[in-house]
């Protein structure tokens, strides 16, 4: 499969949590990051062709997904959303800041898609009921997105991990414990369940940026 080079990037607590509780905005935990950590995050954004989050992240966090703490271009924003249920006032639909692609399915209401297009976003249909990432990734590659930063959340991260179509994972470690059984972690989904199916990583680099430990991992058993 021709696909972009994929980098999952996230802040995580020591116990691997992304938020304080299910349904909470990740911006609360991210408020613990210092400016150097934000610079690190935005330096990656400035180097990639595209950036992706799920529509639940858009609804909860309303991110802009632009480059502000570093110099460089804004990446193309890609939002997979089976029903195209992205709020029409979402920051990602402000296409004056950066281009946006909404990846959706045949079941998305046509009138909804027209409203999104009127705001300047591009719509691509890849799938019947659910967004088909096996179709989406080659389509993004054909559109010139050779490198893709995935900022989650847990469900989107699982779509890449379970298909083994992720090349790197970069983590900003926050020195806190969140706890909780149902709090989203770095990767959601049903899990691999068997030892032989696990995704294997190799530590490529680790360093301190500001007050945060950064780890950068290379995926060993990926599929290109």
UniProtKB/Swiss-Prot annotation:
It is an enzyme of class 1 (oxidoreductase). InterPro entries: DHFR-like_dom_sf, Rib_reduct_arc, RibD_C, RibDG_C, Riboflavin_Biosynth_HTPR. Its EC number is 1.1.1.302. GO terms for biological process: riboflavin biosynthetic process. It comes from the Bacteria. NADP(+) binds at residues 57, 61, 82-85, 131, 153-156. Keywords: NADP, Oxidoreductase, Riboflavin biosynthesis. NCBIfam families: rib_reduct_arch (TIGR01508), ribD_Cterm (TIGR00227). PANTHER family: 2,5-DIAMINO-6-RIBOSYLAMINO-4(3H)-PYRIMIDINONE 5'-PHOSPHATE REDUCTASE, DIHYDROFOLATE REDUCTASE FAMILY PROTEIN (AFU_ORTHOLOGUE AFUA_8G06820). This is 2,5-diamino-6-ribosylamino-4(3H)-pyrimidinone 5'-phosphate reductase. The lineage of its organism: Bacteria, Pseudomonadati, Aquificota, Aquificia, Aquificales.
